[in-house]
């Protein structure tokens, strides 16, 4: 079951409020969700509230942020977002290092074959 942290639309026609929820990828936008992680009201002064520790927990469990939810988390919980980005950079560095090592082994094999 793939999970996403995304915004769920609530409220009235001209006063939309969003909930930040953890939901299955296949559930509809305003459908069933697993856990409420915060809310966002673009019309009020104090316009968001997030549960940072729960967001961090679910991101570590493999949940993915949607683009808009990521922007909200970046604004509301910068520590969580910074740690998420640091993990992504570290993963990319490991992949890059493995790719470099593979290319070096491949070049060595080609040079060895050409020398014969």
UniProtKB/Swiss-Prot annotation:
Keyword Transmembrane helix: no
GO molecular function, one term: structural constituent of ribosome
Domain of life: Bacteria
Keyword Ribonucleoprotein attributed: yes
Listed GO CC annotations: cytoplasm; small ribosomal subunit
UniProt entry keywords in alphabetical sequence: Ribonucleoprotein, Ribosomal protein
Gene3D superfamilies: 3.30.1320.10
GO biological-process terms attached to the record: translation
InterPro entries for the chain: Ribosomal_bS16, Ribosomal_bS16_dom_sf
Pfam family, one: Ribosomal_S16
HAMAP family hit by this protein: Ribosomal_bS16 (MF_00385)
UniProt similarity note: Belongs to the bacterial ribosomal protein bS16 family.
Protein name: Small ribosomal subunit protein bS16
Organismal lineage: Bacteria, Pseudomonadati, Chlamydiota, Chlamydiia, Chlamydiales
